[in-house]
């Protein structure tokens, strides 16, 4: 992979930055907090942003520039002769990856964050990029943390974790095959007596078939005998059923005869009663003609009274409503005529207010802008945690100086610990040699007496205790210094991120200092009062105009109301005239006459009811007489039928033999039960036959499976042996690859580290063990542990090892990114790093280095400077 161009917008301090990278060594220089490392983080996010990165604690809110919707990152790079362009737009949550095809860019993935990351991960895995290509700030000495950490990093770079996974998967397969072998062996043992079971079932099958044949031969004879008896019983049952039906028929006829005789008696009695009642009703009906005259007058007066009362009430109520509305309309006409002058005054006042509002509007907008700036400044201040913006630069300078002091102190104490460890080791060796010595002192060469030996041992032991005490004190001081160093670094990181915010606050404060907020506030308040008065007056004038516009409507309504009132009065007069024409002066006189006619009305009602009842009785008499005639005819017919049925019944009873009928029925039942029992037994035998047959087939199938299991067992035993061999080869191959890679990395790292230390150390030694990679330095031809190194030498070793891993990957990966590789290197080692860059890093197609160290420019092909201006990072190409 070679990175050609990076465009970053709204990413931390980068508002809108574009950088082109060239083949060779690209150096990005600038002061702390300028945005150098942020640019490298933007490359990492642009290439690999996914759920995996979010899970590792990197959040959009942390890298999105304050006051923007989201960062935008575009990276153009080349891989294996093909150009790609990746875009991450966090404001719209959009991402794409395109490939240059001729002169046209074409999509190669779906437009989603995860799809783009997956494709790039196939080109260069994320772990390889993070652990070998991109060496992040503060991680140079991470390789020296522990043997386990080194082992993990080496495995990821060499893809040994995949071989380990294959090794583990083969172990799982081996376990499964062993389980299968056990299951096959259990099955073979379980089916050991399969042949005996088959013979037993075949014998049972033959016995069942014989029973089926015996029953099948007897059933036809018994069924024929049953059919003959059934025919005889059927004939006797037909006669028996006929006798039963005739008895039922005779009972029905006698019952019907009794009911008819009872009905005839009821009809004769009812006819006599209705004849008497009809004579009584005829006497009442004779008075009906005279009563009808009185009823006609009664109805006419009642109808008029109801109409009179309803209409008079409606007219009086309507007159009241119309009169009230007329008074209200006349009042509104008077009010509307008085409001025209008020409208003219309001319109003049509104013109004056509008002129003042137009003059104040620019001042109001200026006030609102100032208040927004003030709110933004307060929001930014809250992020500073109480710090004054002007104090941040002073504190940053102090912390950078303190960081350098701590680096020097840590380097000094680390050297001291190394020297003390060596002195301690020397004293321990001297004590061991002294204990072994006989005759001659190994220290001074004099004769060694027991007393002299004891004195020397006491002396060396006291010196050793003193050295150990000094080591513990030095280590305690080192821990204290490193703890303070981490605090200083954390505070530097925090203040660097706050510097942009502080610059924005200062800029806003300068803009606000040029504005008179009190004057603007007074103008704003006057503006609001005028707007409020204007709205009230506009509402009032609209209401007044509406009322004035309705004046003609009110006048027309007044005229119509007067006409309606006259019409209602006329209708009221007409209904009073109708009362007089009927002969009554008042409604009370009319009510008195109606009360006189009510007794005739009641008699009329009684006579009309009697007339209706008489008609009903006469009609009923006619129907009952007809029904009586029909009943006599039906009774004669039923008596004839009774005689006929009685004759037929006597004839059948004479021919029917009840005893013979019962004997035949009993024999038929016994035969049916015998046949049913045989059929049931036959069904059971056939079911058993099928079960035995199925069992035999299953047993034979198990016999086949048993033979197959024996063959599979042989294959599984061969397979498990091959898996064991393959696991052994994978283990050997993994160890071989790891050893070869570590040897090569060791050679490269030895050369670089030796150059760093001017030959003080002739190289390094690497030994691989299970899940560990142990690292030693070679001093005076002897392997020494890493505790032998001073602080600066440890950093040099870490850098040498990280560079060696990247050099090893040349041919597989042609890109290296270093973020601040020199923070703990002294001047001499920084100079050596330049020589190493010239000699070794030029073997890599493209190297990107971020540093605040100006000395590195001498070794770079392309130099880019980043500085902070007005809270935003600015990019400048130096060479």
From Swiss-Prot:
Domain-related comment: The two conserved Cys that bind zinc constitute the zinc-hook, which separates the large intramolecular coiled coil regions. The 2 Cys residues coordinate one molecule of zinc with the help of the 2 Cys residues of the zinc-hook of another Rad50 molecule, thereby forming a V-shaped homodimer.
Protein's UniProt keywords contain Cell inner membrane: no
DNA repair keyword on record: yes
Cofactor(s) this protein requires: Zn(2+)
Coiled coil: 241-344, 390-429, 462-727
Domain of life: Archaea
Descriptive protein name: DNA double-strand break repair Rad50 ATPase
Xref: InterPro entries: AAA+_ATPase, P-loop_NTPase, Rad50/SbcC_AAA, Rad50_ATPase_archaeal, Zn_hook_RAD50
Biological process annotations from GO: double-strand break repair
Pfam families in UniProt: AAA_23, Rad50_zn_hook
Family (UniProt): Belongs to the SMC family. RAD50 subfamily.
């Amino acid at each position: 992979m070679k990175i050609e161009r990076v465009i970053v917008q709204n990413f931390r301090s980068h508002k809108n930055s574009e950088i082109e990278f060239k083949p060779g060594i690209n150096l990005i220089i600038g002061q702390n907090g300028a945005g150098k490392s942020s640019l490298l983080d933007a490359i990492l996010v642009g290439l690999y942003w996914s759920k995996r990165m979010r899970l590792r604690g990197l959040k959009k809110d942390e890298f999105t520039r304050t006051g923007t919707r989201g960062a935008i990152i575009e990276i153009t790079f080349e891989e294996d002769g093909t150009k790609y362009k990746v875009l991450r737009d966090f404001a719209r949550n959009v991402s794409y990856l395109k490939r240059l095809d001729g002169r046209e860019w074409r999509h190669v993935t779906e437009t989603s964050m995860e799809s783009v990351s997956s494709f790039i991960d196939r080109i260069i895995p994320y772990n390889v990029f993070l652990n070998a290509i991109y060496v992040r700030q503060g991680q140079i000495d991470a390789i020296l943390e522990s043997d386990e950490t080194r082992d993990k990093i080496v495995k990821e770079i060499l893809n040994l974790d995949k071989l380990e996974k294959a090794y583990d998967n083969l172990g799982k397969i081996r376990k499964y095959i062993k389980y299968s072998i056990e299951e096959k062996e259990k099955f073979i043992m379980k089916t050991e007596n399969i042949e005996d079971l088959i013979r037993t079932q075949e014998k049972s099958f033959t016995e069942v078939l014989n029973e089926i044949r015996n029953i099948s031969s007897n059933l036809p004879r018994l069924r024929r005998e049953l059919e003959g008896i059934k025919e005889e019983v059927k004939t006797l049952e037909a006669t028996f059923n006929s006798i039963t039906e005739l008895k039922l028929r005779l009972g029905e006829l006698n019952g019907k005869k009794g009911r008819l005789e009872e009905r005839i008696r009821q009809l004769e009695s009812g006819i006599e009663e209705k004849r008497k009642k009809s004579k009584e009703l005829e006497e009442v009906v004779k008075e009906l003609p005279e009563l009808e005259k009185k009823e006609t007058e009664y109805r006419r007066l009642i109808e008029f009274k109801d109409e009179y009362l309803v209409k008079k009430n409606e007219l009086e109520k309507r007159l009241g409503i119309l009169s009230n509305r007329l008074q209200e309309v006349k009042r509104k006409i008077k009010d509307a005529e008085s409001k025209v002058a008020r409208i003219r005054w309001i319109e003049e006042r509104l013109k004056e207010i509008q002129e003042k509002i137009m003059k104040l509007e620019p001042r109001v907008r200026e006030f609102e802008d100032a208040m927004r700036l003030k709110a933004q400044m307060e929001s930014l201040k809250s992020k500073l945690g109480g710090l004054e913006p002007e104090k941040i630069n002073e504190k940053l300078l102090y912390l950078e100086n303190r960081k350098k002091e701590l680096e020097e102190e840590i380097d000094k104490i680390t050297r001291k610990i190394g020297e003390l460890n060596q002195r301690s080791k020397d004293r321990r060796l001297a004590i061991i040699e002294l204990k072994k010595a006989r005759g001659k002192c190994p220290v001074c060469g004099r004769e060694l007496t027991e007393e002299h030996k004891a004195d020397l041992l006491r002396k060396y032991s006291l010196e050793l205790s003193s050295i150990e005490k000094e080591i513990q004190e030095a280590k305690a001081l080192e821990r204290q210094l490193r703890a303070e160093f981490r605090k200083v670094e954390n505070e530097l990181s925090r203040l660097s991120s706050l510097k942009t915010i502080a610059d924005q606050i200062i800029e806003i404060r300068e803009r606000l200092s040029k504005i008179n907020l009190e004057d603007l506030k007074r103008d704003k308040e006057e503006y609001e009062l005028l707007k409020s008065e204007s709205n009230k007056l506009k509402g009032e004038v609209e209401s007044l105009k509406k009322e004035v516009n309705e004046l003609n409507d009110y006048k027309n309504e007044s005229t119509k109301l007067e006409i309606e009132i006259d019409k209602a009065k006329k209708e009221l007069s007409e209904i009073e005239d109708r009362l007089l024409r009927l002969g009554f002066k008042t409604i009370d006189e009319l009510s008195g006459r109606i009360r006189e006619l009510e007794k005739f009305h009641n008699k009329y009602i009684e006579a009309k009811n009697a007339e209706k009842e008489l008609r009903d009785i006469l009609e009923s008499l006619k129907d009952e007489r007809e029904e009586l005639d029909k009943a006599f005819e039906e009774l004669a017919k039923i008596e004839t039928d009774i005689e006929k049925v009685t004759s037929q019944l006597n004839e059948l009873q004479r021919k029917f033999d009840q005893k013979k009928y019962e004997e035949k029925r009993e024999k038929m039942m016994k035969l049916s039960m015998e046949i049913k029992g045989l059929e049931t037994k036959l069904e059971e035998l056939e079911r058993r036959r099928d079960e035995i047959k199925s069992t035999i087939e299953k047993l034979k199938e198990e016999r086949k499976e048993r033979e197959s299991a024996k063959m599979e067992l042989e294959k599984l035993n061969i397979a498990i042996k091959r898996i064991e061999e393959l696991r052994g080869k994978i283990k050997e191959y993994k160890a071989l690859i790891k050893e070869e890679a570590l040897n090569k990395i060791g050679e490269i790292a030895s050369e670089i580290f030796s150059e760093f230390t001017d030959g003080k150390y002739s190289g390094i030694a690497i030994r691989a063990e299970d899940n560990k990679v142990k690292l030693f330095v070679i001093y005076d031809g002897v392997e020494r542990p890493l505790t032998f190194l001073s602080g600066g030498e440890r950093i040099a070793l870490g850098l040498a090892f990280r560079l060696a891993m990247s050099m090893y990957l040349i041919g597989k990966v042609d890109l290296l990114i270093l973020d601040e590789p020199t923070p703990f290197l002294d001047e001499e080692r920084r100079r050596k790093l330049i020589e190493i860059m010239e000699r070794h890093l030029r073997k890599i197609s493209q190297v990107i280095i971020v540093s605040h160290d100006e000395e590195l420019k001498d070794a770079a092909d392309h130099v880019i400077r980043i500085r902070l201006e007005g809270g935003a990072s600015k990019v400048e190409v130096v060479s």
